[in-house]
Amino acid sequence: MSGCPFMGKKHHFNFSELSLEDKNEDSSQEGLNKASKGGLIYGDYLQLDKVLNAQELQSEKKGNKIHDEHLFIVTHQAYELWFKQILWELDSVREIFQNGHVRDERNMLKVVTRIHRISMILKLLVEQFSVLETMTAMDFFDFRDYLSPASGFQSLQFRLLENKIGVPEILRVPYNRRHYRDNFKGETNELLLKSEQELTLLGLVEAWLERTPGLEEEGFHFWGKLEANIFRGLEEELQTVKTKPDSEEKEEQLAELQKQKELFGALFDERRHEHLLSKGERRLSYKALKGALMIYFYREEPRFQVPFQLLTSLMDIDTLMTKWRYNHVCMVHRMIGSKAGTGGSSGYQYLRSTVSDRYKVFVDLFNLSTYLVPRHWVPRLNPSIHKFLYTAECCDSSYFSSDDSD
């Protein structure tokens, strides 16, 4: 049975029965065709003559037109257009941070909105693989040889995106035992070098986190109070477990408490953090990590709600970039198996090596969940810091700056 309430019944509307008066009273026809008077029109504004004529099939040029090459080209052009939009949003966010505009909390919503927009675009790009996968491996094989030596690795915009977000150069997987920039020449190589020298989103967020209110030792001193509370809590739990009769469960609980003690001992050891930072296992400075954890614990306070959303959106970007890499790996494996890539790389093997935490920029934010503790262990806010976090102010020099930005 159809879900349409009109199925099986005759419902005809006789437009010829409309009177001239009814037709004249049709408000849907009261508009004005401004285009008839000349000026900018849709196709000109979007320069569709350029966009829609930019699909040049190499197979057709060689006299062997392959239908699915058109899909391959359009899909990758769409990726590049979206990469351009991501870079547009990312550059604007970096500019807001660089100019100190985040000190004015009114601009934080702008930052979060644009970062969230980036994550939504990345989500779309992850899903876009499903369109490309409607092409079979044999369909791709039919025109693959026409592409060489072109390769997705040569996407300048994707490499710029990685650099501007903050993928560490030293953690990149070598491309055929060479520096990734060696695959780019002239102006493109210079653009990549310039992007490596600019302040990254990671570095700018790090500096912002270091200014988190409440970290000052002469003030609320969140870090010192948290350390004292955690080790006091662990000691109390240890004494409670020790009173229990000997059993396998007791031994397991004692072992777990020892692990927790070592875990938090490492967290509060600044020298250990610096060591992990030098090895690339941590990305944020010690002070920035303190700020991130404080925002995490007090995220319900009005002043920390938007910063917490920002940290969440930054993790979303990392997650979606990882998903994009993974989907890319799966698609390449499906299309070419273990063959070499068109650009000369090992193909699937190389791409698989990039799906790791080496390419995660905000990995420290993911690891914050490691340090969750019972709520009553979190230092209680004193009246001064509670009042400070309860009200967001414009132009507050202690945390967030007075100039507006675009």
From Swiss-Prot:
<dbReference type="InterPro" id="IPR004981">
    <property type="entry name" value="Trp_2_3_dOase"/>
</dbReference>
<comment type="subunit">
    <text>Homotetramer. Dimer of dimers.</text>
</comment>
<dbReference type="Pfam" id="PF03301">
    <property type="entry name" value="Trp_dioxygenase"/>
</dbReference>
<comment type="function">
    <text>Heme-dependent dioxygenase that catalyzes the oxidative cleavage of the L-tryptophan (L-Trp) pyrrole ring and converts L-tryptophan to N-formyl-L-kynurenine. Catalyzes the oxidative cleavage of the indole moiety.</text>
</comment>
<feature type="binding site" description="axial binding residue">
    <location>
        <position position="328"/>
    </location>
    <ligand>
        <name>heme</name>
    </ligand>
</feature>
<feature type="binding site">
    <location>
        <begin position="72"/>
        <end position="76"/>
    </location>
    <ligand>
        <name>substrate</name>
    </ligand>
</feature>
<keyword id="KW-0823">Tryptophan catabolism</keyword>
<keyword id="KW-0349">Heme</keyword>
<protein>
    <recommendedName>
        <fullName>Tryptophan 2,3-dioxygenase</fullName>
        <ecNumber>1.13.11.11</ecNumber>
    </recommendedName>
</protein>
<dbReference type="GO" id="GO:0019441">
    <property type="term" value="P:L-tryptophan catabolic process to kynurenine"/>
</dbReference>
<comment type="similarity">
    <text>Belongs to the tryptophan 2,3-dioxygenase family.</text>
</comment>
<keyword id="KW-0560">Oxidoreductase</keyword>
<dbReference type="GO" id="GO:0051289">
    <property type="term" value="P:protein homotetramerization"/>
</dbReference>
<dbReference type="GO" id="GO:0020037">
    <property type="term" value="F:heme binding"/>
</dbReference>
<comment type="pathway">
    <text>Amino-acid degradation; L-tryptophan degradation via kynurenine pathway; L-kynurenine from L-tryptophan: step 1/2.</text>
</comment>
<feature type="binding site">
    <location>
        <position position="342"/>
    </location>
    <ligand>
        <name>substrate</name>
    </ligand>
</feature>
<feature type="binding site">
    <location>
        <position position="144"/>
    </location>
    <ligand>
        <name>substrate</name>
    </ligand>
</feature>
<dbReference type="GO" id="GO:0004833">
    <property type="term" value="F:tryptophan 2,3-dioxygenase activity"/>
</dbReference>
<keyword id="KW-0479">Metal-binding</keyword>
<dbReference type="InterPro" id="IPR037217">
    <property type="entry name" value="Trp/Indoleamine_2_3_dOase-like"/>
</dbReference>
<dbReference type="GO" id="GO:0046872">
    <property type="term" value="F:metal ion binding"/>
</dbReference>
<keyword id="KW-0223">Dioxygenase</keyword>
<keyword id="KW-0408">Iron</keyword>
